[in-house]
């Protein structure tokens, strides 16, 4: 059976979301059309508004509706000498939820991936270089993901930071709290053994 062009367009549009295939997109579309048109209209309004009004902070590149995000304009954190480099705005939220970091961020919006056409320019590294050259930064914490691309990105930024007098560190990787060793992959176990701490 073929759907109407508008229904088909809605299904195709929903498939752009991560983890949403044809069947899931169809279920979502039918749920909104059959049972919750009010929520569907609210979703459309919110999505349209976010797409037109949400941009990137001109200092750290995270999501914001303003020129600068709340952290960068904060009197307590906006002038911190410590910058934590992350791959995505979601990483900022994860670190903020922990409440253990009180510095600034720099969001790469990805990682180095030459095969996908993602190089230093796409990651905004010229802006990061400007921050480092200002002399206001004393420490750079690299919190990229523990993947091949994340490691390559961290090494690239660490090399870039060598031109400046500042401490550069990488967040630790290892066994998660509450995790059982038998379920931890060998690479993570190796990192845990190599990065062990005295007690």
UniProtKB/Swiss-Prot annotation:
GO terms for molecular function: DNA binding; zinc ion binding. Residues 81-176 form the Toprim domain. InterPro entries: DNA_Rcmb_RecR (IPR000093), Rcmb_RecR (IPR023627), Rcmb_RecR_Znf (IPR015967), TOPRIM_dom (IPR006171), TOPRIM_RecR (IPR034137). The keyword DNA damage applies. Coiled coil: none annotated. Belongs to the RecR family. This is Recombination protein RecR.
